Curated annotation (Swiss-Prot):
The keyword Iron does not apply. This is tRNA uridine(34) hydroxylase. SMART domains: RHOD. SUPFAM superfamilies: Rhodanese/Cell cycle control phosphatase. It comes from Bordetella avium (strain 197N). Disulfide bonds: none annotated. The active site is at 182 (cysteine persulfide intermediate). It comes from the Bacteria. Residues 128-222 form the Rhodanese domain. The gene is trhO. Belongs to the TrhO family. Catalyzes oxygen-dependent 5-hydroxyuridine (ho5U) modification at position 34 in tRNAs. One of its GO terms (biological process) is tRNA modification.
Length: 242
């Protein structure tokens, strides 16, 4: 049986994380799912694996809560379940940046979809004629597995270092169209808002991250694989473990 893997997140106010944790843990356990769900006052971030039927049943229940009705999901498959346990964890942030003023729920930076980005990369410029630079917001060890060709990589060890790296290197970005990207979209969403907040113009986030880019385009302009935080370790542009 092929295992279905999903990744999804949403920035949305969650004042009831303790109760939500109990409900989601119970539902996931009942369906035999494995993986991790992170809950914080700012939203939800999840990585789950199981049978296709169980995954869809879980998502139906999740989307029955109006706060998650429009949550977008990225799918892949594997021969085995890449997680050993099912954990629902409470965190201060679903992706730690240590900048509480960055609240994606209050307003996102502009995004670029996979097909538009593929066209920009082929052209070498955006639709307004500006040079496009790809900014990798991931940790250095993730970048080493694969990244977009000629992407900017500041060799950060954790996402909390990103704001200082932007301030130090912002001259590299001035006058260009900057597309921030990450695995599934969550880090690049916060990164793009931060760059806008400090006055960098023409900033976009890659909608759905690398995984959605692979899913929709097959990965043109990307060299290598995409590191993932589970037992598969990395996925190729066909979303298969390498």
């Amino acid at each position: 049986m092929s295992i279905v893997n999903i990744a999804a997140y949403k920035f949305v106010s969650l004042p009831d994380t303790v109760l939500l944790r109990e409900a989601l843990q119970e539902r996931a356990d009942a369906l035999g799912l494995k993986g991790t769900i992170l809950l914080a006052p700012e939203g939800i971030n999840l990585f789950l694996a199981g049978s296709g039927e169980a995954i869809e049943a879980f998502l139906a229940g999740l989307r029955a809560d109006a706060r998650f009705a429009d949550i977008e999901v990225k799918y892949s498959t594997s021969a085995d379940v890449p997680f050993g346990k099912m954990r629902v964890r409470l965190k201060r942030e679903i992706i730690r940046m240590n900048h509480p003023a960055i609240r994606p729920e209050a307003g996102r930076a502009p995004s670029v979809n996979a097909h538009t980005l593929a066209r920009w990369l082929e052209q070498g410029r955006d639709d307004d004629g500006r040079e496009v630079v790809m900014l990798d917001t991931r940790n250095a060890f993730e970048v080493d597995v694969g990244t977009f060709r000629n992407a900017i990589d500041w060799r950060i060890d954790r996402f909390t270092q990103f704001p200082d790296a932007v301030r130090e290197h912002r001259a590299e970005l001035e006058g260009k169209t900057v597309v921030s990207f990450c695995t599934g979209g969550i880090r690049c969403e916060k990164a793009a808002i931060f760059m806008e907040d400090i006055g960098i113009a023409h900033v976009y986030q890659l909608e759905g991250g690398i995984l959605k880019y692979f899913e929709e385009t097959g990965g043109p302009g990307y060299d290598g694989a995409c590191f993932v935080f589970d037992e598969r370790h990395a996925l190729d542009p066909a979303l298969k473990p390498v």
